[in-house]
């Protein structure tokens, strides 16, 4: 029997063991999509205790605590931090089979050197031990990033953000990691969203452009894209909960924009038209600047109205959507490809039923120049599990090129989440090892090792081409 989460955790054959320890384990990390705070990175934020580092803002953990019967006061409420931690310690043993069980122990092992299993009995001692370490040297936000061998961090930023801390970090020669902005213009595309006119005003202020027409709106967006570019930004991200496409013209999109600013209700069809044209415009801009565009598709957000009113968004009340994506997605990609304006694109869906839709579609839009120009993004959110990762990788390898996959990201708000890359890398190595053991792939360790290192780091390095000397990538 294998020891619990020992050195060969998830590595079930000799080839996998060799690939992980000799090729994958020490590769650097490019975290090209996350929700870390650039302010906290710049200030090298320290944590008062393990609850602040682990449980604040982590809706993954909150969801299973609720499922375990933990009252909200111990999750997002006003219970003391030690009691919140003990509520988590009570939940962890019940989470076997959930990746959080493994991630929790990986984080304890890698960052704190704690190999004890977390439960109610060990909770008090682990609370004291982790807190003692957190109050010492080497546990600030920057320290945790450096300790994880991260070279690039791409945050998620609104177009109206000042990027103040990105710019300060860019000039900070004492920190060897590039912290780059990620352009997230969702508030500018959801025209029926409450607060849209106010956001347009914020965009006007940020871009220093008067916005009374759709033309001016697009000019302001372009100005902000170029500002992000000057700060080192090379990625955009779009939360497209429902994939839409509706053929339209710039004039019609302009009419819809004007109607909304004047308080007229925008129909569902007009909303689709506005989003379509604005996305097409942004695609052309991203292509010009050689950015990578990310689509996160098919999330069903804020499904519990009572708790949404009580706690707000991003608190653990989202789920998978099951909208059809194939036709609107291909129509959008095709519409910009026809104009030679399709940028590098990474497609994620929260619904695993879309795996083969995406895996098959991406190769319809490869350009024969950039390897893996259109990517099937790594398993996301509820699919960020051993089975979910394997399903995504197998779909990609069955109909595309697994070897050109740009690999893992954290998509996290926690500075302790970089062990997810280790979890992912072990799964990659074991999958390839299984192919070898089954006689499906030759045991050419030089070839397989280079493929593993590509998926871990090298492919992302060549794909994004982040221009930042201090990152040394």
UniProtKB/Swiss-Prot annotation:
<dbReference type="InterPro" id="IPR003766">
    <property type="entry name" value="Uronate_isomerase"/>
</dbReference>
<protein>
    <recommendedName>
        <fullName>Uronate isomerase</fullName>
        <ecNumber>5.3.1.12</ecNumber>
    </recommendedName>
</protein>
<dbReference type="GO" id="GO:0008880">
    <property type="term" value="F:glucuronate isomerase activity"/>
</dbReference>
<comment type="similarity">
    <text>Belongs to the metallo-dependent hydrolases superfamily. Uronate isomerase family.</text>
</comment>
<dbReference type="InterPro" id="IPR032466">
    <property type="entry name" value="Metal_Hydrolase"/>
</dbReference>
<dbReference type="GO" id="GO:0019698">
    <property type="term" value="P:D-galacturonate catabolic process"/>
</dbReference>
<keyword id="KW-0413">Isomerase</keyword>
<dbReference type="GO" id="GO:0042840">
    <property type="term" value="P:D-glucuronate catabolic process"/>
</dbReference>
<comment type="pathway">
    <text>Carbohydrate metabolism; pentose and glucuronate interconversion.</text>
</comment>
<dbReference type="Pfam" id="PF02614">
    <property type="entry name" value="UxaC"/>
</dbReference>
């Amino acid at each position: 029997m294998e020891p619990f989460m020992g050195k060969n955790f998830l590595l079930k054959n000799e080839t996998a063991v060799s690939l992980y320890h000799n090729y994958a384990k020490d590769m650097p990390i490019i975290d090209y999509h996350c929700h870390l705070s650039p302010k906290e990175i710049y200030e090298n934020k320290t944590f008062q205790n393990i609850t602040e580092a682990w449980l604040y803002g982590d809706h993954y953990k909150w969801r299973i605590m609720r499922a375990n019967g933990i009252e909200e006061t111990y999750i997002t409420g006003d219970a003391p931090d030690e009691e919140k931690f003990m509520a988590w310690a009570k939940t962890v043993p019940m989470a076997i089979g959930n990746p959080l069980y493994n991630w929790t122990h990986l984080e304890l092992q890698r960052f704190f050197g704690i190999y004890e299993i977390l439960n109610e009995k060990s909770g008090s001692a682990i609370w004291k031990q982790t807190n003692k370490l957190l109050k010492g040297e080497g546990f600030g936000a920057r320290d945790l990033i450096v300790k994880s061998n991260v070279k690039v961090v791409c945050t998620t930023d609104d177009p109206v953000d000042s990027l103040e801390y990105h710019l300060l970090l860019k000039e900070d020669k004492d920190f060897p990691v590039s912290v780059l902005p990620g352009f997230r213009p969702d508030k500018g595309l959801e025209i029926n969203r409450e607060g849209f006119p106010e956001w347009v005003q914020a965009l006007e202020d940020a871009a220093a452009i008067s916005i009374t027409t759709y033309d001016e709106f697009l000019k302001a967006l372009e100005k902000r894209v170029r500002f992000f570019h000057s700060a080192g930004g090379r990625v955009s991200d779009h939360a497209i909960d429902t994939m839409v496409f509706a053929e339209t013209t710039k004039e019609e999109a302009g009419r819809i924009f004007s109607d909304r600013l004047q308080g007229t209700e925008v129909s569902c069809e007009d909303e689709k038209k506005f989003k379509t044209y604005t996305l097409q415009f942004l695609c052309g801009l991203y292509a010009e600047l050689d950015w990578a565009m990310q689509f996160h598709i098919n999330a069903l957000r804020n499904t519990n109205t009572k708790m949404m009113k009580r706690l707000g968004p991003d608190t653990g009340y989202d789920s998978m959507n099951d909208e059809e994506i194939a036709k609107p997605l291909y129509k959008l990609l095709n519409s910009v490809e026809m104009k030679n304006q399709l940028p590098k694109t990474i497609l994620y869906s929260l619904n695993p039923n879309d795996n083969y839709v995406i895996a098959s579609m991406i190769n319809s839009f490869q350009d024969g120049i950039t390897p893996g120009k259109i990517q099937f993004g790594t398993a996301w959110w509820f699919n960020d599990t051993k089975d979910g990762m394997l399903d995504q990788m197998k779909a990609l390898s069955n109909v595309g090129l697994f070897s050109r996959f740009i690999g893992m990201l954290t998509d996290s708000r926690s500075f302790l989440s970089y062990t997810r890359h280790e979890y992912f890398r072990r799964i990659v190595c074991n999958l390839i090892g299984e192919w070898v053991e089954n006689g499906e792939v030759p045991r050419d360790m030089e070839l397989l090792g280079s493929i593993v290192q590509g998926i871990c780091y090298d492919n992302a390095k060549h794909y994004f081409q982040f221009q930042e000397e201090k990152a040394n990538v």
